[in-house]
Amino acid sequence: ILMAIQLKNDDDLSRMRIAGQLTRQVLDMIGTHVKPGVTTGELDEICHDYIVNSLQAVPAPLNYRGFPKSICTSVNHVVCHGIPGDKRLKNGDIVNIDITVIKDGFHGDASRMYPVGKPQIMAQRLMDTAKECLELGISVVRPGARLGDIGSIIQNYAESKGFSIVREY
């Protein structure tokens, strides 16, 4: 089912920007807590407390379609939407933390990949390539740009580096 794109007014854009900025603040804050020995459940608790109490926002994933936590933590080979729990991070792991906050009716949604200690060579290549894909995608965003064209640039670059994109989850 295709949904029509709804144009936003200046107030909507301002509130969207704020939601995005709050999401970035959570990602910046949690990075200092990503280290060997911490559990993904502990990272979830830290983020939940920060989102609710410091930012006065709502963690969107919590109870969404039965999702039991406030963030998603995808460790190593988990592609996306990993559920935080008792798993302890260890040196060499990589963890993607996906944050979505709701503030004043708008969602801010972003994720960031963090190395735990010193990442293995392939993990570092993955993180570097993902960042380069992000930068390439952003570089072609402009009025009139088509989502398919942006995705194609990202896919082609990822595949040229020996990686693939997620088609379904």
List each language-model region with its residue ranges.
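Active-site neighborhoods and metal-handling regions in enzymes and metal-associated proteins
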Residues: 2-169
